[in-house]
Amino acid sequence: MAFYHRTRSEHWLRDKQDDGKSLILEDESSWEIDPEDQFITARWLRGSTILVEFTEKGEYPYLLRNWTEGERARANFLGEFRAVS
């Protein structure tokens, strides 16, 4: 499992894919969202302020808190997203 070192810092949502199944933050970090929370992240808007927390709980050990929307979702850190040119 990849470990994300920039927890407890403010980030913003750069992009979301597949109706909220995965998210990319401004620091190029890529996140797989817990299927039970994908209906929540499907509504999140680009530019929303996100705080990442490491919870160590279950299959999705990170919690993405969307301060803009007042919502949260469980997630897995997938690593850094790199666009193919």
Indicate where each model-derived feature is located:
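Structural detector for short beta-strands of small beta-barrel domains
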Residues: 1-18, 79, 83
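Short solvent-exposed loop/turn micro-motifs enriched in small/polar/acidic residues
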Residues: 14-17, 45, 57
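Short, basic/aromatic beta-hairpin or loop at an interaction surface
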Residues: 15-31
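Terminal membrane-proximal soluble interaction domains of membrane-associated proteins
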Residues: 23, 52-55
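Short capping micro-motif at the N-terminus of alpha-helices
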Residues: 33-34, 75
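Short nucleic-acid-contacting surface segments enriched for D/E, G, S/T with interspersed K/R
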Residues: 36-53
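Short, Lys/Arg- and Gly-enriched loop/turn segments at beta-strand edges
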Residues: 55-66, 71
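Short peripheral tails and domain-boundary helices/loops at the edges of structured domains
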Residues: 66-85
